[in-house]
Curated annotation (Swiss-Prot):
GO terms for biological process: exocytosis; Golgi to plasma membrane transport; intracellular protein transport; vesicle tethering involved in exocytosis. It comes from Caenorhabditis elegans. PANTHER family: EXOCYST COMPLEX COMPONENT 6 (PTHR12702:SF0), SEC15 (PTHR12702). The lineage of its organism: Eukaryota, Metazoa, Ecdysozoa, Nematoda, Chromadorea. This is Exocyst complex component 6. The gene is sec-15. The exocyst complex is composed of sec-3/exoc1, sec-5/exoc2, sec-6/exoc3, sec-8/exoc4, sec-10/exoc5, sec-15/exoc6, exo-70/exoc7 and exo-84/exoc8.
Length: 817
C-alpha cells in the first residue's frame, strides 16, 4: 500500500506538468469557453444546436484544441482523486475478507445445531404418536368387539344389496333395501357408519329406477330391431291361414309335398309272423327344414318380455306405478310415430313390404303386452294408438302409392296391403278405413287401366285395314269365332274363303275389353265385396271403358277418312254394340260362375247407347263424304248452255257419277238398313239439288233448247238409277221422288204448258205442284235471253212470239204475289 501511494505521486506531478504546459500553449476565447460550458451542462437533445453553432463560427480546429485541453484537465483531476483514495480501498477490502471467513464458520455451527435439534424432536414426536395410537387401538378394539355382533347383519345385508345391484337383480335389491331400512338400521342407528350407509343407500332407489328405465329402453330398442321380423312371421301365418295368394294347384302341390315328407319318416317292415310293422324314423333334417323351423316362431320367441314384467314389479314396489304406465304409453306412442313414418323413399316394392311388416310387428307386440300386462295399456289406449297410426298409414300410402302409374306395381301393393289388413284384423284391430283406401286405389287402378286400353284402342284404330276379315281355313274361322261372339246362320256351310262383315279391329277391341275386365277383377279380389257388388262394379268399369272408347272413336272419325273407312267403322260399331250382351255374360261368368249366366235381375246393364253419338258422327261424316265426292264429280261438268241439239246420250260426268254411286251403294251391304237408306236418299237429294243449282245458277245467262234437252237427258239417267238402286230395302218410287221437283220444272219448260201451270197453280192436284213460279221465271228468262241473242229470231215476223213470252213472264210474276 505505501508503495502504491509513493508510486502515484510522481505520476500526479507529471500530469500536472503536462496540463500546465498545455494550458500555457493553448489560448481559449470567451466564445469557446461558452461552447464548452454549454456542452457540459446541456442535455443530449440540445447538443446538436451547440455543435451547429460551433460549425457556424468556422473555427472548428481551435474549438477542437480547446476541447482537448478541457478533457486533459478532467483526466488529471480524476487521477488525483484515485491516487488519494487507493490505499484506503485496499485496506477495506482486506478487512472484508477476514469478516467473510468468520461469518462462514458461525453459519456452519448454527446449521449443525439445528439439525441435531430437529432429529431429537422428530424422534420424540414419533414416540408420542405411537403411544397415543396404541391406546386408541386398544380402546377401539374393545368397543368394536362388543358391537360387531350387532353390526354384522347390517353389513351382510348391505353387501347383499351391492351384489344384487351388480347382478342387475333390482327387484330383489329393493326388497333387501326395505329390510335394511325398516329392520336392521334401526338397531344401530346411533353409529355414524349407519348414517354413511343410509346416505349411500338413499340414491339406490333412484338408481334402480334409472336402471329399470334403461332396461325398458333397451327392450324398446330390441322391439324396434325385430319388429320387421315379427310382422313378417305374423303376415306369413295369416297368409297360410287364408291361403292368401295360393292357387288351387299350388295348394294341392303343397299337400302332396307334406304327405311325401311325412311318408319319408315311416319305414315299413315285415315281422317274423308275417305282419306289417311301421317304424317311425327320425332322419337328420337338412338345412332347409331347419330354416323353415326357425321361421315358425312367434313374438315371444323373438322378444324377451321379462324386462316389462320386471319393470312393473319394480315400479309397484317404488310406488311409481302410474308414473311407469304413463312413461310406457308415451314411449310406445313415440315409437309408433317413428314406425309409421317411412325412413326412406317408398320407391321400391321391398320398401312397402318392410314398412308394413314393421307396423304389424309393433302392434303384435302391443297386443302381447296388453294380454300379459293389462295394467300397462288398456284396449282403449291400444285402439287410440291404432286409430292415430291408421290415419297416418293411410295418408302415407295414399301419398306415396296412390299416384303410381304402374298397374303391376299397384296389383302387388294391393296384395301386400290386403295381407296387412287381414293380419291386423286377426289381432282385433279395426281395418275398415284400409278397405276404403283399397277401394280408392281400385278407382285409380281402373283409371290407369282405362287409359292404357284407350291408348291400345286408338292404336288398333290406326293400324286397322278397314277390310272385312277373310278366312281361308276352318282353323282360322274357329280362331275368329273364339275371339268374338259372332253367329250367322248357315255361315259354317259356306265354302272357303269365308268373309266376316267386320274388320280385325272388332276382334282386337273385344279381346282388349275382356282383358280390361279381367284386370279390374284382379284388383277387386278379396276386397270384402259380395258377388253382386263386384258384378255391378265391373259392369260400371265396362261402361266407363266403352264410354272412353266412344270418345276416342268420336275424335278419330273427325280425321280425313275415306268412304271405305267410314263405312267399315259404322259396321264395326254395330257389332261392338251387339257384343255388349256377350260382355255382360262374360262378366257374370267371372263374378258369379257359369251357372249364373242369364240371371240379369238387379244388375247394372252394359250401355249400348254410348256409341250412338259416335254412330251419328260417323253417319254425318258418311253424308259429308258422299256429298263431297258427288260435288267433286259434278264440278267436272262443263255444260254448253247454247248447245243447238242434245248429244243423244248422258254427259260423261253423269256416267261417272252413276258408276260411283253403284260401287259405293253396293259396299253398303253390311251397313244397317236404316243408315244405308238414309245415305242413299240424302245423296240423291243432294244430286238433285246440285243439278237444280246448275240450271238456276246466276252465272248461266241463257239456255238453248238443245242444252235443256241434254240436261233433261242427264236427269233422266239419274232417275233411271233410282229405279235400280242396289241398296236393299229402298223403295224406287220414293227414291225417284228426290228428282220430282227438277223433273216437273223441266217438263213444264220443255212442253211450254204454261196454261195448265197458271190454271192449276196453288192447287193440291196440280200437275206441276212442285214447281214454284219464281223458279219457272228464272228458266224462262234464260230461254228468252238465248232467243234474243239468236240472229233474227226476234224479227218482224216473230213479234207475236216475243209478246207471248213476255205475257207468260208477267203472268208468272203475278202468281208470286
Amino acid at each position: 500500500m505505501p508503495n502504491s501511494s509513493s508510486t502515484s505521486q510522481p505520476a500526479t506531478t507529471g500530469s500536472e506538468t503536462a496540463s500546465t504546459s498545455y494550458v500555457n500553449y493553448v489560448e481559449m476565447s470567451a466564445e469557446q469557453e461558452y461552447f464548452l460550458y454549454e456542452l457540459e451542462t446541456t442535455d443530449s437533445g440540445s447538443m446538436g444546436l451547440v455543435l451547429r453553432a460551433i460549425y457556424d463560427t468556422g473555427d472548428v480546429q481551435s474549438f477542437a484544441r480547446a476541447l482537448q485541453q478541457r478533457i486533459s484537465h478532467y483526466d488529471k483531476n480524476i487521477q488525483k482523486v484515485c491516487s488519494f483514495h487507493y490505499q484506503s480501498f485496499v485496506d477495506a477490502m482486506q478487512e472484508l475478507m477476514k469478516l467473510k471467513e468468520q461469518c462462514q464458520d458461525i453459519k456452519e455451527e448454527t446449521v449443525a445445531i439445528d439439525a441435531e435439534i430437529q432429529q431429537i424432536s422428530q424422534r420424540l414426536c414419533q414416540k408420542k404418536q405411537e403411544i397415543v395410537r396404541y391406546r386408541k387401538l386398544m380402546k377401539n378394539a374393545k368397543t368394536a368387539m362388543d358391537q360387531i355382533a350387532v353390526c354384522l347383519p347390517v353389513l351382510e345385508n348391505y353387501a347383499k344389496l351391492q351384489e344384487q345391484m351388480s347382478n342387475r337383480k333390482y327387484y330383489q335389491a329393493l326388497k333387501t333395501l326395505e329390510e335394511l331400512e325398516h329392520t336392521h338400521l334401526a338397531l344401530v342407528e346411533k353409529y355414524r357408519f349407519t348414517q354413511v350407509l343410509a346416505k349411500s343407500m338413499a340414491p339406490v332407489r333412484l338408481e334402480i329406477k334409472e336402471k329399470a328405465y334403461s332396461e325398458f329402453k333397451d327392450f324398446l330398442e330390441n322391439i324396434k330391431k325385430v319388429a320387421g321380423r315379427i310382422g313378417k312371421h305374423a303376415s306369413k301365418d295369416t297368409a297360410e291361414q287364408h291361403s292368401f295368394g295360393v292357387t288351387d294347384a299350388e295348394r294341392a302341390k303343397k299337400i302332396q309335398e307334406e304327405a311325401r315328407k311325412n311318408a319319408s319318416n315311416v319305414e315299413i317292415e315285415v315281422s317274423a309272423d308275417g305282419s306289417i310293422v311301421k317304424k317311425n324314423m327320425s332322419p337328420k333334417r337338412n338345412m332347409k327344414m331347419q330354416v323353415e323351423d326357425d321361421e315358425q316362431v312367434s313374438a315371444q320367441d323373438l322378444i324377451d318380455f321379462t324386462p316389462v314384467h320386471r319393470c312393473c314389479q319394480i315400479f309397484n314396489v317404488l310406488g311409481a306405478k302410474e308414473e311407469f304406465e304413463q312413461y310406457y304409453r308415451q314411449q310406445r306412442k313415440e315409437q309408433c310415430d317413428l314406425v309409421i313414418e317411412p325412413t326412406h323413399k317408398m320407391n321400391n316394392f321391398k320398401h312397402y313390404v318392410e314398412y308394413l311388416d314393421e307396423i304389424v310387428g309393433f302392434f303384435v307386440v302391443e297386443d302381447q303386452i296388453l294380454m300379459t300386462q293389462s295394467n300397462l295399456s288398456t284396449t282403449v289406449d291400444k285402439d287410440k294408438l291404432w286409430d292415430n297410426a291408421l290415419m297416418k298409414i293411410r295418408q302415407h300410402l295414399d301419398a306415396r302409392f296412390g299416384g303410381s302409374p304402374d298397374v303391376l306395381m299397384m296389383l302387388k301393393m294391393k296384395k301386400v296391403i290386403l295381407l296387412f289388413i287381414l293380419t291386423m284384423k286377426s289381432y282385433g284391430y279395426a281395418v275398415a278405413p284400409l278397405y276404403e283406401l283399397l277401394q280408392n286405389f281400385r278407382d285409380q287402378y281402373n283409371e290407369i287401366l282405362v287409359k292404357e286400353y284407350c291408348a291400345q284402342f286408338e292404336r288398333d284404330l290406326e293400324k286397322d285395314n278397314y277390310t272385312p276379315i277373310t278366312v281361308n281355313s276352318e282353323e282360322e274361322f274357329r280362331t275368329i269365332i273364339r275371339k268374338f261372339p259372332f253367329y250367322k246362320r248357315s255361315m259354317e256351310q259356306e265354302p272357303f274363303p269365308r268373309r266376316f262383315p267386320f274388320s280385325p279391329f272388332v276382334t282386337d277391341a273385344y279381346t282388349q275389353a275382356k282383358n280390361y275386365l279381367i284386370g279390374c277383377l284382379k284388383f277387386m279380389d278379396n276386397l270384402q265385396l259380395n258377388t253382386s257388388a263386384v258384378d255391378d262394379t265391373v259392369r260400371r268399369c265396362a261402361n266407363v271403358l266403352l264410354g272412353r272408347w266412344a270418345g276416342v272413336l268420336k275424335s278419330f272419325v273427325h280425321k280425313r277418312l275415306s268412304m271405305i273407312q267410314l263405312v267399315q267403322i259404322t259396321i264395326n260399331l254395330g257389332y261392338l254394340e251387339k257384343s255388349c250382351e256377350s260382355l255382360g255374360a262374360f262378366i257374370t261368368s267371372k263374378t258369379s260362375g257359369e251357372e249364373a249366366i242369364g240371371t240379369t235381375s238387379h244388375q247394372v246393364v252394359l250401355s249400348e247407347k254410348v256409341f250412338r253419338d259416335v254412330r251419328s258422327e260417323v253417319e254425318q261424316q258418311i253424308d259429308e263424304c258422299m256429298r263431297s265426292k258427288v260435288d267433286e264429280i259434278i264440278d267436272l261438268a262443263n255444260y254448253d248452255w247454247e248447245l243447238p241439239a242434245a248429244a243423244g246420250q248422258a254427259s260423261e260426268f253423269i256416267s261417272d257419277l252413276i258408276n260411283f254411286l253403284q260401287t259405293t251403294f253396293t259396299s253398303f251391304t253390311n251397313l244397317p238398313s236404316g243408315l244405308a237408306k238414309h245415305v242413299c236418299t240424302q245423296t240423291c237429294k243432294h244430286i238433285s239439288q246440285s243439278m237444280s243449282d246448275f240450271l238456276l245458277s246466276p252465272e248461266t245467262k241463257c239456255i238453248s233448247t238443245g242444252a235443256l234437252d241434254q240436261f233433261s237427258l242427264d236427269v233422266m239417267q239419274c232417275e233411271m238409277f233410282t229405279t235400280r238402286c242396289p241398296v236393299a230395302g229402298v223403295d224406287p218410287q220414293t227414291l225417284s221422288m228426290t228428282f220430282a221437283d227438277l223433273r216437273q220444272l223441266l217438263d213444264l219448260v220443255m212442253s211450254s204448258d204454261w196454261t195448265t201451270f197458271n190454271a192449276e197453280y196453288g192447287k193440291d192436284h196440280a200437275k206441276y205442284l212442285r214447281v214454284k213460279a219464281s223458279t219457272a221465271i228464272v228458266v224462262l228468262e234464260k230461254m228468252i235471253e238465248f232467243e234474243r241473242k239468236s240472229t233474227g229470231f226476234f224479227g218482224i215476223a216473230k213479234g207475236d212470239r216475243k209478246k207471248l213470252l213476255d205475257t207468260i213472264v208477267r203472268q208468272l210474276k203475278l202468281l208470286e204475289i
